[in-house]
Structures are given as C-alpha cells and as structure tokens.
Amino acid sequence: MGRGRSEIKRIENPTQRQSTFYKRRDGLFKKARELAVLCDADLLLLLFSASGKLYHFLSPTVPSVREFVERYEATTHTKVWADIRQERRAELEKVGSMCDLLEKQLRFMTVDDGEEYTVPSLEALEHNLEAAMRKVRSEKDRKIGGEICYLQNIIRGRQEERYGLCDKIAHAQTLKDVECGSTSLSNGLDLKLGFN
C-alpha cells in the first residue's frame, strides 16, 4: 500500500506550517548535499523562511557564493552583482570626495605660520570660524536654557511642597487651638455649673 498523496496547498495552521517547513527544508538540503556529492555538481541553494530567515547550502567544490554568481552571470549573460557593485563604487567615490573635502577644510582651519594665505582665503576662514562660534554659542544657550527650566521646575516643586506643609501646619495649629479652646470652654462650663 502506497502513501496517500495530500493536495499541495498552503497550510493554514501556523504551527503545522512551520513544522512542515523545517521538515521539508531538511529534506531539501539533504537532497542538495547528496546531489552535490554523488554527481559532483556545483550547487547553490538559497531559502528564505516566511519570517525572512535565510538558509543556504553551497556545494564543497565551490569556493564562494561570489564566484558561483559570477559564473552564473558569465553563463547566462546577466548582471546580478553589477548593479550592486556600481552602487557601492558610487558610494565609495562620494565618501572619498567628502573625506577629501573635510581634510582640506581641516587643514585650512589650522592656520600654519609658515604657509602663505590669500586675503580671500583668510576671510573665508574667518567667516567659517564666526559661523562655528555662532553654532557653539547657540548650542550653549540652548543647554543653559534647558538647565534653567529644569531648575525652575525643581524650585516650583519645592515651593508647592513648602506651601502644602505650611497649610498642614496651620491646619494642625487650628485643630490644636480648637481643641485647647473647647477644653478650657468645657472646664469653664463645668465650674459654672458645679459639676466638678
């Protein structure tokens, strides 16, 4: 009696779907390993789970994924890595030009006595330094303003605490005065009425 074939459709139960994924993944990777060893085939298997986790297999005869993809590009006349390489090259050039510019500005900022500067370049340096000073002052003022607000809030909280304590003291004093007054009043009544 043969195994019953189930209809191939998406498994609705997430737990069962995950369990089936892991079992079938292991079977797929086992078959890939067997194919690579038995037939001496170069094989690259990439698998992403539903959660986005990557699983991969590369046959032992292939040195790296990059070489495998380059071989694929050469065989199929497509460019898998070309766009990525071009983007990276453009990014490197951009970063390199930014580094050159920053190094030039840094050298310019450190005025060397032995070096000759033109009046316009010195004016530009002065302008840059003034702009930097304005930025520093602005940031300092912002920080000081924040500290002042923080301290004012603490003072306000302490004053409210103080007012609350003063109210409690006044209320306690009033209760004490009322208590003392009622005691003396009751003593006075007792004396007058002769209940002592």
Curated annotation (Swiss-Prot):
Pfam family, one: SRF-TF
One cellular component (GO) term of this entry: nucleus
Molecular function terms from GO: DNA-binding transcription factor activity, RNA polymerase II-specific; protein dimerization activity; RNA polymerase II cis-regulatory region sequence-specific DNA binding
Positions of the MADS-box domain: 1-61
Highest taxon, organism lineage: Eukaryota
Main localization (coarse): nucleus
Compartments reported by the entry: Nucleus
Nucleus recorded as keyword: yes
Entries under Gene3D superfamilies matching the protein: Transcription factor, MADS-box
Gene Ontology BP annotations: regulation of transcription by RNA polymerase II
Domain (K-box): residue spans on this chain: 85-175
Entry keywords, A to Z: DNA-binding, Nucleus, Transcription, Transcription regulation
Chain's role: Probable transcription factor.
Name of the molecule in the record: MADS-box transcription factor 32
